Amino acid sequence: MRILLTGIPSYLQRTIADVSGTTVIHRPYFDETRTKKDLIAQVRKIANTGNYLIGEGAAESLRGHNVTYLPFWHLANNRDSNEIFEQVNREFDLCVFASANLLRPGYSADLEAEIFAKLTMPVVVMGIGIQRKEGLKDQLPAGTLKFLDVLRKKESFFLTRGYFTAEFLREQGMKFVKPTGCPSLYFSPNDMKRSLTALANPALAEAQKIAFGGYLGSVADTIVDAHALLKPDSVASYVVQDELVAYNLSLTGGDTDIAYDRSSARITGATEYKHSEKWQRKYELLVYFDTNQWRGAMSERDLCFGRRFHGCIIGMQAGTPALMIAVDDRMREMLEFIGFPYIEASTWNRETDKRAYLANFLGKIDTQAVIDRYSACEGNFRSALAQIGL
């Protein structure tokens, strides 16, 4: 099948130099990332580096087909060109749109509505989810309601992040809706199972090689976690995803100052952010633009821990145990669907002896039940793809 893949990209799409019609032109190298300006630009391009896992997972699920990734910006920039959309409709049999928490009050899907209205082929929306449950329909922007209306009227398939999104879309009249979870969950199933097996180990509460993830620049929660779990002479490794553009983690130097070491993925420039004075451990800030480098680094950790879904999934893809702290409905929907062990943020935050609580929690995990649930979800995902013809 000739598949048009668009939406959230994998890290490989960082090499795209130009697009002409349906021909994508790639550079034989990645953009240089060394200065403050370079670093911020690379984060801004993807908005959140965790998104690369979504695009990568979607692409991997289409292996075996004739797949072309066309950047969504190319379709958007040429939405008034009948010639280009005639070419797209002629050359592809199916469109797969890699998505995330598109159903949210702060995002209006006007462009998606306009573009999908121009496609004559069926559309698969893969990985669509919500940000917050409360008042969802009443708060969705007009552009997003139009997007749903367009897809309701054509042959469309929705693979959702979880049950709530699926229920919501069915209420909107969508015919083919399957809760499948994020496609990143099925990128490397054997390693995911290895990670889940390793997690049921109380000794991990004493681990010192931990990759932390959270919302540095906004709240101090991750700093508190590091102090609770790490010994005074240990180094806290914090993985940045979108904090440089969304959560006021600022680089203080000039635009041309060296701020990033690509080999180690370490931010070397001086930073400034809320609560930074509270650190009582040495720490490093890391940011990855290559998912293979990211997985390689996580494979050397004892544990991935924190409030970022994909910041933990990348570790699981490397076979490293990972435990998430659920902070919002978006995370809860995905975690409840896939059945991974997790701790509610409100519960974790009020624990005074976090290390003891963690050891007790890990010791109670039913590994076989967790793996059985994951395997069932993977089978469900493959089955949904097969029903679509993928």
Residue ranges and their predicted role:
Residues 1-390:
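Active-site anion-handling motifs in enzyme catalytic cores
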